[in-house]
Amino acid sequence: MSVDGLAPVRRGPGSPPPGNGETHVWVFSLDVGHPVLEALHALLSPDEIGRAERLRDPRERARFVAGRGQLRQVIGDCLGQLPGSVRFKYSPLGKPSLADDAEAARLRFSPSGSDALGVVAVRGDAEIGVDVERVHAIPDIAALARRMLGADEHKEYAKIPKSRRETRFFEYWVRKEASAKALGSGLRQGFHRLKIHPWPGDGPFQVDCVSDETRATTWVVGVPMPVAGYTAALAATQPIGPVLTAWWDPLAPD
């Protein structure tokens, strides 16, 4: 995997977590060599190992192990714990958090993965969501865009050149998915209920979620990825301050 502009980083256990308003975004490869994969597998909990074993495709299984292992490394370093000792819990819709309530109150995180690239965002003072997607061709993308976008968003989408529409579709997707993760609602509300404004532009943007069940606002920014062909976004339930993006190396020296 060709990485542009981010040096490999591995912090030591107990390194300071993000300060108020600050977010750390760690980017890593999900395609790792067998020795690294074995080391990451050793960090997983029994339920994570069970989830991995239920995946029939060998590459999908290996990427799951690589993603969960490196997530544990990132969170363990923030907490000053061994990666294998980190305990997670999940909301009914699958949003992960730390099992210990005191730890969960001071450290929020959000993982994402697409194809060969994984991302973990960490923040201390607000709920967050991150999403990364590989830009690729989708059959009948026009119909999917009509279902996903609001009226004003679709007008903007329809005006851009056809050669740019796949990229713009995924730019919309990651912003809405990251916002849904920050709110903990997943896809339940429907992406057409998430209104991005102002858009397009440099951001940060606000994303309003209005439905019978939810009225909420998140803030969202694009996160440049160091690997060509991917797009990503970060969302939070409070305004977004400084964002530090770094490449995570699971075997770099502490």
Where are the predicted features?
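Core catalytic alpha/beta fold that binds nucleotide/phospho-ligands
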Residues: 1-254
